[in-house]
Amino acid sequence: MARQNNHYLGNPHVRGLDDVHDWTKEEILEFKKCKDSAVYFAENYCQVIHVDRGLVPFKLYDYQKEMYDHFDNNRFTIVLACRQSGKSISVVAYLLWYALFNTEKTVGILANKGDTAREMLSRITLMLENIPFFLQPGCKALNKGSIEFANNSRILSAATSGSSIRGKSLNIIYLDEFAFVENATEFYTSTYPVISSGRSTKVIITSTANGIGNMYHKLYEGAVQGTNEFKPFRVDWWDVPGRDEEWKKQTIANTSVLQFEQEFLNCLETNCQ
């Protein structure tokens, strides 16, 4: 067990820079398994807050595992997902894995509101605080807006304003709920030089549907038609375990057909069936 003065600013759950860890053979094997697979890392070492059960292990659904493979194998990913499908928390765990097991990488989390971006960073912090020290590279800085590790990788969070990432070299850019970002076209135009400046920079865009004509809709439709570099990934309501026709019927009864269509049908057309 690490000594108290080797914690980050007295936080007993975050490894400090001066911590010296004596590795066991089992830990070395586990580290390699985690480094080689985001799915293994997430399922075995990440914890999330469940609305009824509190802090619980993060068990990925099949479509979440497929999403990780999609991230690994594509530089540009755009995800269309129904409401409450776990898309954001899935990406959060993936970004933590990427920063922990790669050196000198910078991840940018951008959301339509600064509070939303910081909330996602707080989820990453919670995950970090619940993984063992041998998987943590040591922490240089941890605050509401960023985390920086001893391996010189860092995670930044910001609102999707035109100046939020200018001048920064990013290895992964994550845009959350992009269909709801105001002035999304202006933002994307100002962001694209950052994206295109590196040959390996990954872009992950996720959102629920928000009608047609917006920048998200344009990018997603272009991905489906193969006219841009993005590769589409879709999560429908029936992909989520526990959601069947009876669940659909009950949800509509408790809300309305219109609300169900808006929240769960992934409608990018004017008329949804």
Where does each model-flagged region fall?
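Phosphate/NTP-binding elements of NTP-utilizing enzymes
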Residues: A2-Q273
